[in-house]
């Protein structure tokens, strides 16, 4: 849309937590929407995505992080890897609430986990692209029962809905980013004059055409 196009042309950093906001608008309770969406809109609360695990990368249905109901709370135990927004205020976390469910994805639920909750250990790791991700360990992390997003054991619908929205968001952003980069390249090629112009080079013209 126009907003994303303008952001990419300005080379502005991406802000907010659009993926989690969309999931809350689709599956969250009115109370959750009132509590979390305004802070996301203001850019005051980033939400990470706690999906992948050591034994559950591309096969998210194999995740083992557990959530067990304990009165008015859920107890979270497990490990998440490759988490990029580990420094966010909240984690949008997938956990298993029925270890015997068949098929396995039928026993997954989604939660909002405050990242300042006791029992969370964060171990950041540097990457080759000068960014960081983190291994995050959850050890008897207690969260309120109302932090469940969607229905118990129906988190696969929430999770896949969030992933589908992310594909559209990221894919559209990449197309706009490439288009902007091409326009910058074209301007650079056309900027010179005479012998200094790259536009007259056959190889450059061929590469630009393809």
Predicted regions and their residues:
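Glycine-rich beta->alpha junctions and the first turn(s) of the following alpha-helix
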Residues: 119-210
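Short beta-alpha junctions and helix-cap segments that line functional grooves
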Residues: 36, 63, 79-81, 122-125
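A short core secondary-structure module
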Residues: 79-122
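Internal helix-loop-helix
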Residues: 1-46, 83-90
């Amino acid at each position: 849309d126009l907003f994303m196009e303008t952001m990419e042309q300005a080379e502005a950093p991406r802000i907010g937590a659009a993926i989690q906001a969309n999931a809350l608008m689709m599956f969250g309770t009115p109370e959750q929407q009132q509590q979390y969406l305004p802070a996301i809109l203001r850019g005051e609360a980033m939400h990470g995505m706690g999906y992948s695990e050591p034994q559950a990368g591309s096969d998210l249905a194999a995740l083992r992080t557990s959530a067990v109901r304990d009165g008015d709370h859920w107890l979270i135990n497990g490990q998440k890897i490759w988490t990029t927004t580990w420094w966010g205020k909240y984690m949008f976390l997938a956990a298993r609430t029925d270890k015997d469910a068949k098929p396995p994805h039928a026993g997954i639920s989604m939660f909002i986990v405050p990242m300042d909750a006791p029992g969370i250990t964060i171990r950041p790791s540097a990457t080759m692209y000068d960014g960081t991700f983190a291994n995050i360990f959850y050890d008897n992390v207690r969260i309120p029962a109302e932090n469940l997003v969607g229905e118990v054991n129906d988190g696969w619908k929430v999770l896949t809905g969030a992933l589908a929205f992310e594909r559209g968001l990221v894919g559209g952003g990449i197309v706009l980013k490439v288009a902007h980069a091409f326009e910058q390249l074209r301007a650079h090629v056309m900027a010179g004059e005479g012998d200094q112009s790259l536009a007259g080079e056959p190889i450059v013209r061929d590469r630009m055409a393809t």
